[in-house]
Amino acid sequence: MAEEKLLRQAVWQCYQAEVTDQISVSNLQVTANAGVDVWGRKKPQPALLTVTVSLPQPFSSAAEGDVVDSSTVHYGRLSKSAISSVEKAGPSWLSSMDLAQLIEGAASATASSVSLAACEVDVFYPKGSMLGDGAGLTYSKAYGDNTISRVLYLKNVRVPCIIGVNSHERLMKQPVVASLWIDCLARDQTDEYIKVEQMLIKVSHSDSKPLQQYKLRPCIRPLRNHPLRHWSPLQRQWWLD
């Protein structure tokens, strides 16, 4: 089996620019014995699954005949295979990475009659964050060159912060909603979102603007495989380096 090449999500998406058609199912509700809860415990928890498969060629015949044929993937079967793979996983606990790969394998098997260009699986835990909307992992894989992407994220974490350098701005903390992505994530760090949220909260309590800007970097760096650039022009998001 060819060695997987880990890429930044934005770079991986550039490689998929020539993909013509995609089939996606979003927010499939399951209870998964995967990841960790807000207390860091390995217990079953609700999860929302989003699976997207990319085709190297347009499904013209299916569109012209208004029928699901061998040129495309039936989204109903794609949904059922993703949910079934989680239900059949058994009582053994899975890391978020293992769960994402399990679902990716099920999606690939469901589309066995179609040549897939890529598959992306997003595992989102609505109860995976104490102060935010949740946490999750996005796992992307291209089958042609075996390139992959792993992104750990926190969504809408609400923290009070001292913002600004003027004296009147430092009299009271202001509510801030922060979302955080960690790209090029190491495989064994896909369940560290609780630790990352704790780091984010700790930094937000600092009264120093420079600390708020830079203190997270040395904490998050060990979670990744290699450094990142500051700015992703494709996604228009800041990334820690």
Please place each PLM-identified region on the residue numbering.
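N-terminal, polar/charged subdomain of small-to-medium soluble alpha/beta proteins
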Residues: A2-D241
